[in-house]
Amino acid sequence: MLRRALRLRLGPCLSGRGLGTYRRGSTLDWDGKVSEIKKKIQSIFPGGAWNPLYDTSHLPPERSDVVIVGGGVLGLSVAYWLKRLEKQQGAIRVLVVERDHTYARASTVLSVGGIRQQFSLPQNVQLSLFSAEFLRNINEYLAVVDDPPLDLQFNPSGYLLLASEEGAAIMERNVKMQRQEGAKVCLMSPEQLQKKFPWINTEGVALASYGLENEGWFDPWCLLQGLRRKLQSMGVLFCQGEVTRFISSSSHMETASGEQLTLKRIHEVHVKMDHSQEFQPVECAIVVNAAGAWSGQIAELAGVGNGPPGTMQGTKLPVEPRKRYVYLWHCPQGPGLEAPLVADPSGAYFRREGLGNNYVGSCSPTEEEEPDPGNLEVDYDFFQEKVWPRLAQRVPAFETLKVRSAWAGYYDYNTFDQNGVVGPHPLVVNMYFATGFSGHGLQQAPAVGRAVAEMVLEGHFQTINLSPFLFSRFYFGEKAQEHCIL
């Protein structure tokens, strides 16, 4: 009964939400007027430093149709598609709130920048196929007049996934599905693998899958900056600050089975300004939670998961920060320029970095080995004890590698099924999610942004059906399990 009630409510309510409440008046026009007034004052008082107008350019606007919490690639992609799909230019005011505009701790810029279609769920294959098309035609999507074209430095070297005897049948099923969805992937026997990549030790490998198109790696920072540049040209507003509070109203409904539900609607977002105790309230119609590894905390601020255990109101967003290391090493006798990104059955992976016999890679820790996410310090012992032996076993040339540097970043790790959370919350009716992708959010961001924008503007997914990724699955226990997590 609860499932039916939620579906009935989500349909008409989402498509009927108005976004036009705060559209009148342009902050861009006001900023222009302020600039003109300042120029006149300076001409009257030449050489004077006096400014009678308090500079509020660092503050968010008092009102915005949509507030996006998180300025990484996922949040920026949502903003892009909201503006691209709006019915009338300038119809929707969008504000992106990012607490660190240096992106020093951002998952986007600390990732290895890979893109692949080799997943175990068709939705993930579809998302990555569209994202590959987006990246391939990046200057058609993100071109800005009079600005130079973007160069994502895409390396189309593919992904090579290796399977043991135990995982071979699963790999065969996955590849069959990937091909049905349009991905260009081939299967390779150990003999074929040895012939194409003679530097690989095929011991323990029963089967391999190799991406022939639309796979490789690119520069995440370039994509991030390209999106920001495009959004500024589209009139999207940016604010450096931290969301600390939501002001909501509540209403109540009863399901056919007699269960009481409390519906919330966010009316105001409080943004604490950087290096200050000051906060700015922002009235809004829609909130998008794209806060990555910290999206669980943002959801809690909105009351998500604060109800009795076992109820929809008590169901938390199961996304938390997980620290992952990336190591860079030098190996003159390594695989060389033809090396794809290789993912070993042991969990280790690596790829070439540049043209100077450098490589990057790592492996994910077990649950018992999970490092403290409270800092981004690197554990070099983890490489020595866990990563290097696996690399050297698969690629004997790596016996002589020399580590040159390393860094750590965060996964927005979905502990439920390691898959994304996309779309509205069932009870906080105007909060939408774009989070929880557990390491593959960067590569799927263009498609996820489009999906969230479709849901906000039309009330349903239009191009890719991401219903299995809705928040309600956590309450109903319906896992959309992704098995191909690197």
From Swiss-Prot:
Q: Does the keyword ATP-binding apply?
A: no
Q: Cellular location of this protein? A: Mitochondrion inner membrane
Could you say which EC number(s) this protein's record lists? 1.-.-.-
The main enzyme category here is oxidoreductase
TM ranges are 66-82
Cofactor names from the entry are: FAD
A family per Pfam: DAO
Gene3D superfamilies in the cross-refs? D-Amino Acid Oxidase, subunit A, domain 2, FAD/NAD(P)-binding domain
Q: What cellular component terms from Gene Ontology apply here?
A: cytoplasm; mitochondrial inner membrane
Q: What is this protein called?
A: FAD-dependent oxidoreductase domain-containing protein 1
State the gene name recorded for this protein.
FOXRED1
